[in-house]
Design a protein with these regions (language model features):
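Residues immediately within or flanking Cys/His clusters that coordinate Zn2+
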Residues: 400, 417
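Active-site metal-binding motif and surrounding structural segment of the metallo-beta-lactamase
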Residues: 50-97
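Short, non-ligating residues that shape and space the ligands of small metal-coordination modules
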Residues: 409-413, 428-432
């Protein structure tokens, strides 16, 4: 039970190995479904087709002798919509609520749009269940065009469709951020502007819980999760650090990136992530590239192109609108190295990328010249890091706050327990000076 009137009726899938046929999910997946029990009963979404019987049993157990009045469909991917027909066959008096686009997709999936039992909603439409009033919010391309979200004003719950979801079944405990970030950038990350539009739409709502279609219901510190989605969808830097993504055939490129990682750590880089693209989960590598502020790509010239794993990785980045990052390049080749130019061209459509002045060029193996280039690249990357820290420190020093009661000016950050020395009011009555 999530609230007194809201119950979880979803399922866990530990049989799945690849979500959407491409994302490794060693901890399985959850397909979430919820039910609001009021004068009228609303079921939120169905589940993957393998779990029809379990899901329908969950509904029966939650409702007892009662029957549902509505099935609300937030998203039409089959892991959430496969049992719409089965639900409506079991509960012939129930109506299905969805967007117009969703009903068009139902026609494609099921050969019918359930025209005799449907309620088509638009942005801002409301549904009264009794004490629970639901408001429907359209969320197109987060991450399909038909997506809606629902806000329950009574319990202050946002049903967020695939947004705020994560990989992993609910009976496996793990840190939310890691698998939620990998999920976001793997599946939703391309649609940052659309997510930003939804965040603006929900900003005025008093949200105390978020119920996504995958992963746990978020019931504490909700602003933290919304803040992360704001950072991710605006392609901001979540953490300072350097990701070094590489491929290596005979070990020489690997030696170069290991040397670079060593130099970065010696210079105090806050985080260095070294990723062998041929042996790592590509989605985790993509996640790291979007998490940190700097990325180094190191690969070999291969078949007059670049090594396939690096090519696929850059394609994944570009498809997801990789931007606002510093990028360094390391190329290796024994007779006609051209990898750096190819990698840079592949990233040419990405916005606001700053390429380092230093490009490391290796002819077969490291020598004095290329070792010096590695040193220069490390210095350039760490120099930017130091400059960013100094800028942040200077900004903190130069901030000025003005007391709205007496006009007293305070320079620097305001401590939480600060009191105005003139009139004694707390920091909540200070405003940041322009």
């Amino acid at each position: 039970m999530i609230t007194n009137d809201l119950k979880y009726i979803g399922v866990n899938d530990h049989e799945i190995d690849l979500f959407e046929g491409q994302f490794v999910v060693p901890d399985g997946m959850s397909y979430n479904s919820y039910v609001i029990l009021d004068e009228k009963i609303a079921v939120m979404d169905s589940v993957e087709r393998k779990f029809t019987e379990e899901w329908l049993n969950n509904i029966e157990n939650a409702l007892g002798e009662r029957t549902p009045d509505y099935l609300i469909v937030h998203h039409m991917e089959p892991d959430h919509s496969a049992n719409i027909r089965n639900f409506l066959q079991k509960y012939p008096e129930a109506k299905v609520i969805a967007s117009a686009n969703a009903f068009r997709m139902m026609q494609n999936f099921f050969g019918t749009d359930f025209s005799d039992r449907r309620i088509v909603i638009k942005d801002g439409d409301k549904l009264n269940l009794g004490k629970h009033e639901l408001t429907f919010l359209t969320a197109p391309m987060v991450h399909w065009p038909e997506v809606i979200m629902t806000y329950d004003a009574c319990d202050k719950v946002l049903f967020s469709a695939d947004a705020f979801g994560k990989f992993g079944a609910l009976d496996v405990e793990d840190e939310w951020e890691c698998e939620a970030r990998r999920y976001y950038f793997g599946i939703i990350g391309k649609y940052g502007p659309q997510v930003q539009a939804v965040l603006k739409k929900i900003a005025a709502l008093n949200i105390q819980s978020i119920c996504p279609l995958h992963g746990p219901a978020l019931k504490e510190n909700v602003d933290h999760y919304i803040g992360l989605y704001d950072t991710w969808s605006s392609y901001g830097v979540e953490s300072e650090g350097v990701v070094i993504a590489y491929t290596s055939i005979y070990g020489h490129t690997k030696a170069a990136v290991e040397l670079l990682a060593q130099k970065l750590e010696e210079k105090g880089c806050p985080k260095v992530v070294l990723t062998d693209l041929a042996r790592s989960d590509w989605a985790e590598a993509v996640e790291d590239a979007f998490r940190y502020g700097k990325l180094v790509l190191a690969t070999t010239t291969y078949n007059a192109d670049i090594f396939p794993d690096m090519k696929h990785f850059i394609q994944h980045l570009a498809e997801r609108n990789f931007q606002n990052r510093t990028v360094g390049l390391i190329e290796n080749g024994s007779w006609a190295p051209k990898a750096a130019g190819i990698m840079k061209e592949m990233l040419s459509e990405c916005k606001n990328l700053t390429f380092t002045d230093t490009t490391v060029k290796i002819l077969s193996a490291l020598n004095e010249e290329s070792i010096a280039q590695v040193e220069a690249l490390a210095q350039e990357l760490c120099g930017q890091e130091e400059a960013a820290v100094e800028t942040q420190a200077e900004e903190k020093k130069t901030k000025k706050y003005i007391c709205t009661v007496c006009g007293y000016e305070h320079e620097g950050e305001l401590p939480a327990d600060y009191e105005c020395p003139l009139c004694g009011v707390g920091p909540d009555l200070f405003e940041l000076a322009e």
